[in-house]
Amino acid sequence: MAKLIAFDQDAREGILRGVDALANAVKVTLGPRGRNVVLDKAFGGPLVTNDGVTIARDIDLEDPFENLGAQLVKSVAVKTNDIAGDGTTTATLLAQALIAEGLRNVAAGANPMELNKGIAAAAEKTLEELKARATEVSDTKEIANVATVSSRDEVVGEIVAAAMEKVGKDGVVTVEESQSIETALEVTEGISFDKGYLSPYFINDNDTQQAVLDNPAVLLVRNKISSLPDFLPLLEKVVESNRPLLIIAEDVEGEPLQTLVVNSIRKTIKVVAVKSPYFGDRRKAFMDDLAIVTKATVVDPEVGINLNEAGEEVFGTARRITVSKDETVIVDGAGSAEEVEARRAQIRREIANTDSTWDREKAEERLAKLSGGIAVIRVGAATETEVNDRKLRVEDAINAARAAAQEGVIAGGGSALVQIAETLKAYAEEFEGDQKVGVRALATALGKPAYWIASNAGLDGSVVVARTAALPNGEGFNAATLEYGNLINDGVIDPVKVTHSAVVNATSVARMVLTTEASVVEKPAEEAADAHAGHHHH
């Protein structure tokens, strides 16, 4: 395949055009008065959303050099989303501003390597300042504020806070579609663990990149499943009964895994295979916990149950099971409440009788999993399009609330970043030459989120940024009420973790772009050009 190569200024300008195309589509959604973007979906109706990462994921540009830029900034949004689950629009904007500011200086003759040193130092300083400004979040009201700011919906904010209160900040909160138009919270018995699907071919819900199984058969196997003849009879029984299947085993490898993947692709059976978590005795104990929760029998030759002889009586079940890349959540297992309670009592006795701190910690973890329960937020709305939009908002709100509980919050609306930018301007004086320019470049970029929040609200962004810069920590511009005030008291707050990962990911990509001297892309195929030749509009 022939390649096209661009050098120097051309390479960087192409990348910048792509960065701008993507970032400009995303930044209109920023702030309480941000607008929506409509995405054309191959299946189903168009999606109307203001979720930055969803928009970014959908964008691919025709010009290959520009597309490089778009994909680089997309990676900022996706990474920030993976770590913090929110703040993707802020991250995208910071990257765009920093790249534009940096490239302007490179074009004017600045040394990219020195600029980068300045940007890196400024980023470190920014993270220190964020930590210094953080206030801890303790009560439900504050968590509700964080969730409300993230979803722009007070009802959602309160439901998310109630969910977090019920299951704790490390508890599991899942989002499902409701059958009615109401959005409601229910806390169900459930258990989750940190292992995901063995193969991405098991995914059956492409929007969430998860495998979702309703009322599946649950097969728990103590050892590896590696022999197809042993495993086939049981698999055939499941296919006949037309139920989805969840397999949890030490491992599924070779032919059995291939068979499951092929049948999953052909849609013969809805199936997911997951490795059992932990090792040794802990794995054994946790499998027994799962057996009680789902009312299954563990297939284990040690107790005389072999895979090739097992029938449907070994299956357990649950109302719903979702499996993502790195987590499995079992909601409403079929096990009786009495048996689960008896199991808890047994673990409590183990905790009381053990001398080893490690064993005690691990047993407490199991107890927490068995007692934790799972909060299910059922999202309702009048139309399919609205349900999808609201589900994205609820997921963002859960992530924001969890991030806030972990690392605290700062004043929102981009105001904390504007005030940190003032600190950076003073800090720049400690540097010489192009490093100083680098520190200042980040200071300029940090003002952009506040600028666009104000612009989207129909005001002059630069005036708002200048006024905010002069205010004390915690105060700033509230774009919802269009007034200046104490944002923390007004509940306009952002989780530190979200802003932190936005700054880290944006500066990392910007530094890569600034040091780019050439870009290499595949030459577009000729046929494509001819196909359009007959369609000139005069």
Swiss-Prot record:
Forms a cylinder of 14 subunits composed of two heptameric rings stacked back-to-back. Interacts with the co-chaperonin GroES. ATP binds at residues 29-32, 86-90, 413, 478-480, 494. PANTHER family: 60 KDA HEAT SHOCK PROTEIN, MITOCHONDRIAL (PTHR45633). This is Chaperonin GroEL 1. It catalyses: ATP + H2O + a folded polypeptide = ADP + phosphate + an unfolded polypeptide. Keywords: ATP-binding, Chaperone, Cytoplasm, Isomerase, Nucleotide-binding. One of its GO terms (biological process) is protein refolding. Belongs to the chaperonin (HSP60) family. The gene is groEL1. It holds the Pfam family Cpn60_TCP1. GO terms for cellular component: cytoplasm.
